Amino acid sequence: MMGDAADGGTNTNDATEEYVFSVDGANDAPACTQCSADLHSILTCGSNPTVVQTCTGDLGCGPGGCIDACDAANASQSSIGCDYYSIPPDAWTHGSCFAAYVTNNWSSPMTVNLVWKGTTINAAPYAFIPQGTGTSITYQAIPTSGIPAGSMAIVFINQLASSDVYYVGCPASVKTAITTVDVAAKGTSIGDAVEIQTSVPAVVYDIYPYGGATSYMPSATLLLPTPAWNTNFIATTMSETPAATPGIDFVAQQDGTMITLLPTIDITAGTGVAAATANTPVTYSINKGQTVHIMQAASGTGVDLTGSIVQSNYPIGVWGEHYCLTQSASPPNWRVVGAVKGTTLTYDPPVSGAPTTLTVGQLVEFAGPGAFHVQSQDNMHPFYLAAHRPGGDCDAAHQEIPPIPTLGNEYVAIANESADYDLGGPETVNVVPPAQFLTSYIFFTDPTYGYTDLALVRVMAPDNTFKDVTLDCITGPITGWQPVGTSGKYEYVHVDVQHAGAAVGACNNGLHTISSTGLLGITVWGYDSAASYAYPAGASVKPINTVVVPPIPN
């Protein structure tokens, strides 16, 4: 499966937006101000900013000063937002429990609505706060005021009772919003996404199925808020045999959305979706909330849409997915895709067999060590990097694909800790570039998995020191950090939250917080017998390049 857009986190080392305005009309206000990354403060510009004003209540920093918090989040184009779309994968565990983890990233209670096929659903009866850890987790209804500040709730979106052998229903003690139909699109067709609306800025992940260790088909992704969507993408899926059925989804947030795709392979027609020829642009039209769901041949080679260029007239969300991802015991464990011709790559430490050059849409898979740094020549040569792990049987997959402007020109690659083929199913997860690391995260680990591993990366601070990192279940700072390569800029460590079905010290599966005064990246891995999920716990998802790759060459 795939995991993957952003957490309840902050990045105090790197303010996200600069606006020139006068605070509250004061004549002595600084000429230039900027917003803190968490949007709670107005700061002076420069490398050592000071707080000019704190935005309280439902206000956040944005153009002109303290404005509505959701408007501030929209203006920041960060991973924190108030509007998301979610889709479950087209997997053989039809109708299983589809849920979203909604983290309240603000200082006031949050209400949540779901919108599906034009109908708005108050999510309060279907939102529950997990209590406890491990197998003792219970689900508490949210307060009448909403999800508390700094907390998270699981919103149970969909389930449809099924006789499928690996069907996993939602916990018996909770209520589910949609129970009369499976919201997942089936086969190449026009479908419908579920919109998630929050009253204050949030970070949202989805997981399918929730509690899915016994399904052998889990999938999770970190969602991007719609203001962080874009009009230009390079598609990434994965071709595997014997029954991968790789696919791609496009989701619209506006009526009249036109999506032009330059496919790398032929596309077979489906319900409402026209056929297309490789290397010939094709355009699809959908309206708000609709999806173009393209699933490819079930087996063989030449069925992978990776490298296809996508451009739209309005911002869209793009997902890569797989019906049944399979993988041999000794696969390449890294996937890199180029966005610009003439891209050159350097590695620290050197990685035998890794590509040193890339062109537009080129996919290269390679094996590499547990930790390395890879970088292109500059930020006008961004590229995509994903981590992959093998596993028994097959696994469903879906991930929201980062748009081209959010791709980095450098990454720190940390492999999954487990090398046991029988532990976990095949899994792929986006690697977040250090330019989008945060300083704190709130995240939830599924209690039905016997193994949970946190892969952490920290960045040397401007004062040439590494800052302590604290996890809520560990007394004192995390220890055991190892250097990545020889540059001295990055360190990494693996932290087990659960191992072989047992707690690790005071740590166990459930709700967690982690923080530092320096920049920190975190990938959550959960795995069990023939089942895996993974997602980045967060990312700033701000635009970090100005590259545009048109599907119709100029």
Annotated model-derived regions:
Residues 1-30:
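Ser/Thr-rich, Pro/Gly/Ala-heavy low-complexity intrinsically disordered linkers and tails
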Residues 2, 7-8, 24, 45, ...:
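Feature targets compositionally biased, intrinsically disordered low-complexity regions
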Residues 19, 59-61, 318:
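Broad, structure-driven detector of short, well-ordered beta-strand segments within folded domains
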Residues 24-29, 49-54, 300, 503-504:
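Short, solvent-exposed secondary-structure boundary motifs
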Residues 30-33, 64-509, 513-554:
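Conserved functional hotspot residues at active sites or interaction interfaces
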